[in-house]
């Protein structure tokens, strides 16, 4: 084998090893998690998912815990920053299946936007400011505005509404329902959670 050939083979092997190492160092998969805490063991939460299976969630160092407390449609005022989980309607409006009211401190941190969601097949999420909120025979009609658009939202009377509030690890206890927006799936199958939203006093996350 010539020196040139040996160098070529060596370069190919090095490139393959480099590519393999790079693939192994890729960022963990980001996942959303909805479920109920079954057990707390040190820093590990055993969570039963709505699909019926369980997984282990480990809050990251300095994980942010945000509580969700029960609220109502009457609590939503013009100018509030809200998240609307909804189903698109034929006329282009959105029919809410859940609403959450952000804390003032979350404005500017949580982006205003409209995007596909996975609460139900075909569902959407709109983080936006409430421009109007009027009573209607079918509930409430809200106009909400986000960074590059606005949506008409129909809110039936039985739509679950929650308000975000400061929380802490004391809220993470058996029976509490949680939502993890951006968990990181680790090679061992556990989920590392940089932030956890947790229902307080039996509240279920509506998003």
Regions found by a protein language model. Name each.
Residues 2-8, 14, 18-207:
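Short, flexible, surface-exposed loop segments at domain boundaries
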């Amino acid at each position: 084998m010539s020196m040139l050939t040996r160098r070529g083979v060596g370069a190919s092997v090095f490139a393959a090893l480099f590519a393999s190492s790079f693939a192994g160092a890729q960022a963990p998969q980001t996942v959303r998690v909805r479920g109920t805490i079954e057990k707390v063991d040190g820093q590990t939460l055993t969570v039963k998912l709505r699909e019926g299976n369980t997984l282990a969630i480990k809050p990251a160092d300095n994980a942010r815990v945000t509580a969700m407390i029960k609220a109502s449609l009457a609590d939503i005022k013009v100018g509030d920053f809200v998240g609307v989980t909804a189903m698109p309607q034929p006329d282009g409006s959105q029919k809410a299946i859940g609403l959450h009211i952000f804390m003032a401190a979350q404005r500017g941190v949580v982006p205003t936007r409209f995007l596909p969601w996975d609460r139900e097949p075909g569902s959407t999420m709109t983080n936006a400011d409430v421009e109007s909120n009027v009573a209607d025979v079918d509930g409430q009609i809200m106009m909400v505005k986000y960074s590059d658009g606005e949506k008409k939202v129909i809110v039936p009377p039985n739509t679950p509404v929650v308000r975000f509030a400061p929380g802490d690890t004391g809220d993470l206890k058996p029976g509490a329902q949680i939502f993890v927006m951006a968990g990181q799936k680790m090679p061992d199958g556990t989920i590392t959670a940089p932030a956890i939203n947790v229902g307080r006093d039996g509240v279920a996350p509506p998003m």
